[in-house]
Amino acid sequence: MKNEIYDSMLSRYDLKTEQNKRNAIFEVNQQVILAGLYSGGFFESAAFYDGTCLRIFHGLQRFSEDMDFSLLAQDDAFDFSKYFQPIIDAFALVGREVEIKKKDKKNFGKVESAFLKDNTDVYDVMFQTEKSIKIKIEVDTCPPLNFKTEQKLLLQPHSFMTRCFTLPDLFAGKMHALVYRAWKNRVKGRDWYDFEWYVRHNVPLDFVHLAERCKQFNNEDITLEQFKEKLKERLSTADIKQVKEEVLPFVRNPKELDIWSNDYFVQLAGMVIIE
């Protein structure tokens, strides 16, 4: 379906291959979702975080599929469904029809629920025109706190602000995932790619927020030295071939991964700046 705004957003991407085109459609749709959430006032009580946030607002050179949000404070009565209509309206403005459904976590398998708390609600945004594309939205309604946020600007599909975790707190969330995430009995290479990005860009790690995540998710009161040991063990023992294979469909330049080895990542860990 032709739409000037939507087509303009897609035109910024390299669409030569089917994988590239699929990644680009994902990302354009994610930005439209953010615009809808802004219009509905969602960011007055919540913030965007994790890989897709890093991709859209900080130029991470890999594509990301899911969208993760955290409330600014615990709210057991939080109802995300009131934001369905603003999202639907945002897509209507760019000529797209969408359907949003809350997922029943009782039906989740071990893979899907491995890193999902009881206090996280999950929603799927599905598209009439691109049937194979489904964007998963997770909202943590009882989040680990001690994080900071900032407002970040996007200009398409129109000018709007998104409340995001600051980089040190995004880094904290990623380091927690890298060390603790159990995912399909293997590692999630995208976590490793993002870890490399944070170190390369000299982003300091907010250990206070990281410790808060360890306490809430894993019931661990952890010191910095203990976390460093866990990180080193994870980095030195993982199957690097598996790590590379998992992230490959999401990166533009596969040669970036040539240097990857266990020793490479252990050395990166030694370069982490603590805030």
Regions found by a protein language model. Give the residues of each.
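Glycine-rich beta-strand-to-loop/alpha-helix junction loops that act as flexible
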Residues: 49-52
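Structured mid-to-C-terminal alpha-helical surface segments
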Residues: 1-31, 36-46, 57, 72-275
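Short glycine-biased active-site loop of nucleotidyltransferases that positions the nucleotide triphosphate
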Residues: 55-63
